[in-house]
From Swiss-Prot:
Family of this protein: Belongs to the PPi-type phosphoenolpyruvate carboxykinase family.
Compartments it resides in: Cytoplasm, Cytosol
Alphabetically ordered keywords of this record: Coiled coil, Cytoplasm, Decarboxylase, Lyase
Keyword Cytoplasm attributed: yes
Biological processes, Gene Ontology terms: protein heterotrimerization
Function (record text): Inorganic pyrophosphate (PPi)-dependent phosphoenolpyruvate carboxykinase, which regulates the carbon flow of the central metabolism by fixing CO(2) to phosphoenolpyruvate to produce oxaloacetate. Can also produce pyruvate and diphosphate from phosphoenolpyruvate and phosphate.
Cellular component terms per the entry's GO annotation: cytosol
Top EC class of this enzyme: lyase
Name used for this protein in its record: PPi-type phosphoenolpyruvate carboxykinase 2
Quaternary state and interactors: Monomer and trimer; forms heterotrimers with PEPCK1 and PEPCK3.
Keyword Transferase among UniProt keywords: no
Amino acid sequence: MFNQEQGTDYPVLNKKKLESLANLKLAMGGHEYPTDDLTQQGLKLAGPLLEEVEESEVNHTTAPIDARLQTFLNSYFAECGEEVPKIPDDTFILDREGLGRVLSFPPHKQEFFCETMKSYKIKQGVLHNPAKDKRTTVGVFHICQSDVPVPADKIECPKIAFLRMLKAAFYGAPDDHLIIPYTAECKEPTRSWVSLYMRPVVVPGVKGVKGFEHEKATEMHFFVPGNMVSCLDFVESVFGNAGNPRLSKNDAALDPLGWTGHSGMAILAPHLTRMTKKECGLPHISQATERQKRERMCWEKEDELYNDGKTFKMYCRDASGVICTIIADNYFGYCKKEVKTQISYSANLYGFAEEEHAGGAVTRPSYDLGEACKAVQYAEGYKFSEMVEKNKHSIIVKEEGYAVDKKYPEGIIYVPEDSVFTIEDASIKFNHNGKEESILLTPKVNYVLPNGYTIILHDTMTSRRWTLRGILPQYTLCHKPCTVSGGGKSEISKSIRDAVIEGSVFVNNKEEDFKAVQEIFDHDFSKRYANGEVKPIHILDPNVTLGTVVELLTPSHLFTKEHNDYISSISPLIVELVMTIKSLYREDWKGDWQSRITVDKINGNEGNELKYRGANLCSQYLRVGFERDETTWRVFQLRKDFFPAAKLQMEDDITASVIVPTKLLKTPINNMQKKACKIVKNCELRLFQRPDDAVFRGFDKQTEYDFSIPGHFISNYQPMTREEAKDFTKDVVRLYQYTEPMRKCLQDFVAGKDEAKYIVSSSYTRLVPEGDKLVGSKNPRYLQRRPDMLDPEYTYMTFKAIQLYRKISDEEPLYTPVDAVLSGRRNNPPQVAKNGMKLRPLSVFAPLHYFELPELLMECITSMTGASPSMFGAGSEGALTKGPFNSLPAVVDLNNYLLGMICCGYSGFVSSASYCGPHYKVAHDISLLIPEIWSKMRRYEQEPKYLIEHGYLEPCPDVTYNGKTYSGKRLGYRITTAFANHFLRTLFSMPNSVMPEDFLKPELQDLAIYADSYEYMSQTDKGIAMNYVKDGTVEGACPPLKALIYIMANGEYNGMTRESKEFREMFDPEVVLNSEWYKERLVTRQKLEVAKLNKDLAYLNKTIAEKPRLVETLNKQIAAVKEELQYVSSEEYLIDIDGSIGTDPYPYKCMKH
């Protein structure tokens, strides 16, 4: 269904066929359907067959998942003494991808309006604007009483209330909510529930590793009233479609090695906000418990509405592996987050794995290599012949001595290590069998050296039109977990390209400026070091890199005062000229650079714009935040060899990760010294993007391109008719601020070049009420196809380069685990929210901090955030930012996170978004910058120990204000001026100008605000920790986490404080991995898996007895399960999984039976 040519999805679906399928399914259910000739003819022919199907077993069989869910509900609510509602088995099942989109509109209408949604067919796909434009997390999450405690940050719901809500959801849905939009124009519209079956990933598979090789998914059945079918279109677009749940081939229990053993259900029922507390069975206030009074889960007046008539999500679950959810709203964010919640539930019960609120990307450094280069300097130690031998199954060797890729022969060409690339004659030359061979150098082709180093002829991001771009095979997988809303999860994987600005290179006076440049080239730099070391250097020496020149011209504590004074006296314009000439200079110029760099004559006088080979020379600049007025951009010149890092997105929001002992891997990874590593998988097929910067026309090029093509699912934008679009585009100046794709899309629509009635613009968000006026929504959204799926050749090339670099064959497994953990926080100065509430400042963070494990866990436990456009309010987002979406006690997630960090030996860094301190607004500029820096750092430079020893990280200082001292220990370490000068030189021409001292030290911006921020953070730490103590879930925390929570809440634990040596030793890897509680987790994982596999065998045998036709298929499954059972039951299994996180026994210990 994916159209590679158009770069989008749904246009390749045959709309007519899907409509015919919808008609057929309606007819089978005895419903009226919109008529068309094709369907009429088909139904006449298929009449007898339809009668047979109606009588068939499938039509009247309860889906296996529904049987599992019903068994759970009957057992769970047996004590209530009331009827348990039956899960509907006559729903309209979306068993084909795209069917939900067709059902969302009447076939001959361009819009559909109802109480909960306004929907439009637009030029770019579909636009759905739900009643609310964002979600809230305040008072929303309710959990039904069970053996597993309900955390204090959730509202506890009595079983009877959930049961009555469930009845009202299924039996009390208003008639108009049940109308399927597709049939809305029929005389008798179809009123029905619509459902979708999904199998979202929970545990990624690890190829070749026994016990970890099978990818495992949970199962979920999602029910919505008919007119909310667009919510299922949305969910399907993100998580996929697992087909008809009634069919045996789709029964998760018949795929036991690919199933976690867990099942879930979700029901949309916005009408439930009208139910009263009394109707739900909540007690009168005179009979209520203290918790019920505190949470308002009781009533005084009979007409009081449940949850005060506001949105809520209600869970019922225990540790048996079944979860059911009722959602009293239809905002898309709730639907997506519900699937996330159920993935998280399954991961926490299964073990080995985590569901993470994370973004991430494989990031490879990239450089401008100029107009010519020799491959030998980039592929030292690698031979073309050896590469060919190891890649027999994936490449075709040509007789001229090069090779092409079997899968992408036109886009990927493998060349020998002695290749010479030259743009001037568009050639790649190399020796083969004693003679020189030559092939044509063409754009957009990956020329791959034997070590995976990739060279591409490129025409953008350069100071001249054509250049050679080199991409290293060495990579860093930057993983951004525990990242708050608006903290930059998506940005870590976005190319920085969109943020780069280009401008011409100027001189004030050519003769004088060239003379100043030559003086720098002739300057004696040998005595620059303060320690007296003599190191002669000549800038134009071909052995001197551009990075060395940047270092040479950047003030440093390593240099003498005289040298620092000298380079500080050089004007930025002259520095830019020096860098420009250095980047262009070739050895055969023999020192004569002045004749090659020219200016035009204008009106008889020399101009100011420099040219090379007749083309204007360009410089590139990058924004890093705003000045204090919050409108003036802080823009800095990039190095002349700058190219954005080559990024491959691995995560965006919902990540399934598994921690695997390194000893089990079949091939090497970046760091074999660690006990374990984390392997991640993106659970989403499409990404629910919020393109904040698209409101600035022309800035977000990717969004503007996406909005120029059809097939998208869009929300919270303002629809425009052709007339409205005509008025919108009359402002020609602003129209031409868009990039060409968006501008042309609008112009084509206005010109009537298509049948669409509506269009949206990427900068024109939905108008929503704010007080007495309408303003643009701050939460515009659209579903973007995953970049790695949009460009499969680039994805393939990324992993191929890594495989070649590691010298492993094309048949061996390739592992790309996480290398760096870089979480994100969203900061803010003191603010007043739209509802008038004052938001306290969160202004203590520098651009980047490093935390030792206790302080990192404190960050993760509270997950504080400033205001975000995604939701209402600010404050704590709960443990690991998953508070609102965790149906089990958060200590389970925190235990897993802590163990994962220890097993894998990861270091915890946290970057800033929105603000650095109260006065430097940075938006997502830091989020984009960090992966660029990290990709260019050597592996040892990424280690905190090295950074601290070399002065690149410093402990945050204690700060005193109004006689009170605030300990810097809570804030860990932060980057220094030395870090900025040293590591930013890989990106910027003048790195010392990018991050001034008060940018790196927020207390210098405003001490009062800094102190208030610290107070706010301390109070939140204490308050959140007290919740774990009050609800008793602290007892489920592993020993170091338990001690930390008590210290956060009370200041000490068993005589230990956060500074105590014995407390900090509790986090020592050797202590943790040799502890009894860790060993118990491994045994728990073994016991659970043995029990599950035995249950699987019983189900398979039962199914064979009931359905003999499946005997051949199921016998294979039985053999595989028996083999797995034998291994899992062995002592070998316990030894093998040592280094994994095992399974947390806490939820199971809570169960009373």
